Structure formats: structure tokens, C-alpha cells
């Protein structure tokens, strides 16, 4: 009768208005075994945003980062993969932190993964278009964690998300 709490880091929404596509892909569960809550981990969703309607690239995005936890190790969601340069790709979402033991609270280890950075998609004259960065993974509220930073659309680091609220 063990109660589990899962935290999911979602990636950026996939959007291509010129094709009428407005959708989002949420995080996916990773494999876990055993009764320990620390082994339950959810990965970040796959980000993806077309910044322009004329895209010569593949349009694929960076994959979502996974979340992981094991034994006494520090618990992090892993970083979303960046998009491919030249393909107008968004970074993948950061992995959500797994349900974690409260013993890690305040240790600085309880953070969701950062979103992957978007990469330059097109350069026309002095204008450069970038894919969006992936969303940061969720932190565990029960362990006092915070969300990961969003990936910068220009390859920089995004602002930290506010700390998650209980529930």
C-alpha cells in the first residue's frame, strides 16, 4: 500500500499555425522497478516550435531529458537535448525530478532539469530566427525542490522558473 507521487516535466508545445497544428506533447514515464519511490522517474516531454513558416530544416526538436534517482545520489532531472543547428529546432523539455526522499530537502540537489537551448534556424540579412528553448522540468515539492530553468532561445540560459507550489 505504498503511495507514489510523480512529477512530470513537460516540453515546449509543438506549434505550426500555418498547418493548423496546435498541440503539445507531455512528459513520458521512464522505466522504474521496485517499491522505492526514489526509483519512480518521469522524463521531460519533447519540445518543438516552428518559429517561421518557411523552414528548410527537418523541424525536429531536441529530445526530452529523463529524470533519475538512485540510492543516496543527488537527485536531478537531466537536461533536455538542444535542437539541431540550422533546423529551426526547439530544445527538449528538462526531465522532471523523480519523487524524492525529504532527506534531500535544502541540499541544493532537488532540481528539475533545464530545458535544452533552441538553435539558430535561419539567417536572412541581419535577421536571425531561433527555435524556442524547452521548458524546465518540475521539482519535487515534497523535497523542497525547484523547477529547472527554461532553455534560452538564442542558446543562452533562461530564467529560473518559480518554485512549485504544494499540490
Locate predicted features.
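Low-complexity, glycine/proline-biased repetitive segments and flexible coils/loops
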Residues: 1-167
Amino acid at each position: 500500500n505504498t503511495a507514489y507521487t510523480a512529477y512530470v516535466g513537460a516540453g515546449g508545445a509543438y506549434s505550426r499555425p500555418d498547418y493548423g497544428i496546435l498541440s503539445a506533447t507531455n512528459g513520458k514515464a521512464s522505466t522504474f522497478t521496485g517499491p522505492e519511490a526514489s526509483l519512480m522517474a518521469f522524463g521531460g516531454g519533447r519540445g518543438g516550435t516552428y518559429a517561421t513558416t518557411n523552414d528548410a530544416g527537418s523541424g525536429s526538436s531536441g529530445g526530452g531529458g529523463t529524470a533519475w534517482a538512485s540510492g543516496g545520489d543527488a537527485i536531478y532531472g537531466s537536461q533536455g537535448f538542444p535542437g539541431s543547428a540550422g533546423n529551426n529546432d526547439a530544445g527538449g523539455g528538462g526531465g522532471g525530478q523523480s519523487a524524492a526522499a525529504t532527506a534531500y530537502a535544502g541540499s541544493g540537489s532537488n532540481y528539475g532539469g533545464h530545458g535544452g537551448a533552441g538553435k539558430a534556424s535561419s539567417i536572412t540579412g541581419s535577421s536571425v530566427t531561433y527555435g524556442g528553448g524547452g521548458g524546465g522540468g518540475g521539482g519535487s515539492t515534497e523535497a523542497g525542490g525547484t523547477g529547472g530553468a527554461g532553455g534560452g532561445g538564442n542558446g543562452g540560459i533562461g530564467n529560473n522558473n518559480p518554485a512549485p507550489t504544494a499540490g
